[in-house]
Each structure stands twice: as structure tokens, then as C-alpha cells.
């Protein structure tokens, strides 16, 4: 597996994962809009045949990074792909000069919360009713980004 920037040929694979992972998936257009943005890193985890195993979207603006979206194909979860994507987001955040990375995660997504906590993310708050499909709360987690993270 390798982590690389998204390309146009990855979009079908990203959309397939997005649509099975989230009740209200991002549109194809939302991903396409991110391609040219200087402050955005849209990454894919690619397998041996260059198939998309997972992806992440992270923005770095004004010294902070926001991990907006991350998903791994359901058949490949538990293999460390999500961890690798988050690690690469942290590395790129450090290289971009961010001092903090934060994210929102569904309050009921225990597996994701365990992963983030194991990577040094800490609880910072709750966004009540954040997810419009169910009204579920979002838990806000963040982590300091250190200069040493750039070398990961």
C-alpha cells in the first residue's frame, strides 16, 4: 500500500467508498473542487493494482489543519489503512506549518475514536446535532502538531 495524492482516475474508487461509508456522502463535485486548492491535501491509499483502499481530505489554513473526511473500504478496515492516512495528514500538516490538527467524528463511532486517541488526539468538545442525517452529535478531537511530525 502507498499513500499518494488523488488523481482524476481515483475518483470512481473514492466515490464507491464514500457512498458505502456515509449516510450523506460528499458529492463527486465536492472532491473535484478540492483537487486544485493549495490548502487542501486529498490523499488516497492505493493497493498493488492502484485500486483505492481509502482516502482522506485535510485542509491547512492559518496554522491549523482540519481532517474533514476519511474513509477506508469496508472490506479493508482494521488493516492500518486509516492510521496510515491520518499519519500522512499529520506529516503534511507539520510540513505546512500547522500547530494543531482537529476533526469531528460521530459520537457513536467508537472504532474511529479509539484510533484517533491512540494517535494522540484528545477530546475538545461536542457539536450538538452536527450530523444532519440523524441529528447525532459530533465529538471534536484535536492534537498538537510538532515539527518532528514532519519527519514521519
Model-derived features: positions:
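Acetyl-CoA-dependent GNAT
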Residues: 2-77, 86-96, 144-151
Amino acid at each position: 500500500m502507498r499513500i499518494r495524492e488523488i488523481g482524476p482516475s481515483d475518483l470512481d474508487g473514492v466515490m464507491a467508498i464514500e457512498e458505502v461509508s456515509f449516510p450523506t456522502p460528499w458529492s463527486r463535485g465536492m472532491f473535484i473542487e478540492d483537487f486544485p486548492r493549495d490548502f487542501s491535501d486529498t490523499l488516497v491509499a492505493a493497493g498493488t493494482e492502484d485500486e483505492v483502499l481509502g482516502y482522506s481530505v485535510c485542509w491547512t489554513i492559518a496554522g491549523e489543519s482540519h481532517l474533514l473526511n476519511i474513509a477506508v473500504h469496508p472490506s479493508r478496515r482494521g488493516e492500518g489503512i486509516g492510521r496510515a492516512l491520518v499519519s500522512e495528514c499529520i506529516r503534511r500538516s507539520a510540513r505546512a506549518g500547522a500547530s494543531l490538527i482537529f476533526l469531528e467524528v460521530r459520537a457513536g463511532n467508537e472504532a474511529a475514536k479509539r484510533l484517533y486517541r491512540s494517535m494522540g488526539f484528545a477530546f475538545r468538545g461536542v457539536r450538538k446535532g452536527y450530523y444532519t442525517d440523524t441529528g447525532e452529535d459530533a465529538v471534536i478531537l484535536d492534537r498538537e502538531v510538532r515539527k518532528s511530525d514532519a519527519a514521519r
